[in-house]
Amino acid sequence: MTAAAEARRTLHLGAFMRPVSIHTGAWRYPEAYPDANFNFGHIKRFAQRLETAKFDAFFMADHLAVLNTPMEALKRSATVTSFEPMTLLPALAAVTERLGLIATGSTTYEEPFHVARRFASLDHISGGRAAWNVVTTSNPHASLNFGIEEQMEHDERYRRAREFYDVVTGLWDSWADDAFIRDVESGLYFDPARLHTLEHEGQYFSVRGPLNIGRPIQGWPVIVQAGASEAGRQLAAETADAIFASARTLEDGQAFYSDIKTRMEKLGRNPDHMKVLPGCLVVVGKTIEEAQEKRAVLDSGVHYESAVASLSIALGTDASAFDPDGPLPDIPETNTSQSGRERTIKLAAQENLTVRQLAQRLGGYSGLAMVGTPKTIADQMEEWLEACGCDGFNIMFPYLPEGLDDFVDKVVPELQKRGIFRSEYEGPTLRENLGLPRPKNQFFD
């Protein structure tokens, strides 16, 4: 192998599996599994297929509330029921060996001790394959499920998240890697000098510690983030090992990639220690025309009522009262996701879309989509990789199981043939497969 070939960058691939498709019409697609997000047998099969294809990770996002949308829209949604991620992923850990397992943990409605303990447990159960997707929870209806009338202000959620991260990682470092002696003869189970009590006192949390579970196999589970606002980008640059990005064009991807890596350099972090993975809906056909027809059938499954609900979520305001055939009116700022709102307003303006057209796009999928043959899809992925628009992708399958099987059976071999995706896992842990270092213990190393 030449030096150039050895130095060639390769893709990392995650699978976005909650909801089982980002597309609201997916459960209605011909021969799709309409119960795929609440059927363990199906999900087990999906995870095992992803592992066969050498995917880096299975990503299980989470929602802490049924969306408070009109029943005409809600009754058409397949996202009203799904497994709780930290119950599902240990079950998947038992039926897989190398696939990374990423779950969402809210920094707004959880407590650091609970999150630290759960993810440390998952890391041990899985043999070092756990990852924590750090979210501040933008859904304004979630607060009502926790006895809180008003959602926390956007930037304050991120300030709380930063302290939350410090507490969780401090708890993971409670024990030195060699703390547990388990000397049967002397009766000494652990070395007290290798235990650190956190004693954290901050603006949002008071946590004594230590954590009552040994240090995770990976040191820390992989830290994932998905914020795209100014506060979200900065949190990712400071803390994350991977970021799920939203970029509809290569130019957008390059700008985001450069911004995140530059922020890391300014903070003294190695930019190579962050993997930028844009979300990408992939529809595969034998020909480009067949793939486009599949996408058209998929989009035809979106009802206007559910499309308007998706638009309302993106904007953070009720869009059902807007004139469907008029332009998008001025949208006031809200306390939900800032980046999602800005992307939606920009899309409407750039393409001169009516409210109805915009809703249909949001109800289907308005982000990055690659619709074509295995070759043309691989061409696009290779272009993004070589142009520094990404380090890989968080793949969104259009429908299940066919969409997943098409990608695994047809696109992955094409990527492997080009030498831009692995044929075997690099190691047993998610950090090894992502090419990430094991964090040093801040109290003992």
Report the location of each language-model feature:
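N-terminal beta1-alpha1-beta2 module of alpha/beta enzyme domains
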Residues: T2-V95, Q218-P221, K346, N441-D445
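Alpha-helix-loop-beta-strand connector modules within alpha/beta enzyme cores
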Residues: A73-L101, K266-L267, F407-S423
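An alpha-helical appendage that flanks or caps ligand/catalytic pockets
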Residues: T2-I22, D155-Q218, E251-S258, T262-E383, ...
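Hydrophobic, small-residue-rich alpha-helical packing segments that form membrane-like cores
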Residues: A4, G14-M17, Y29-G41, Q48, ...
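Short, acidic/polar
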Residues: N37-R49, Q225-L235, T373-E386
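Conserved, mostly hydrophobic/aromatic
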Residues: L13, L50, K54, L92, ...
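Hydrophobic faces of well-ordered beta-strands that scaffold small-molecule active sites
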Residues: L11-A15, F58-M60, L99-G105, A130-V134, ...
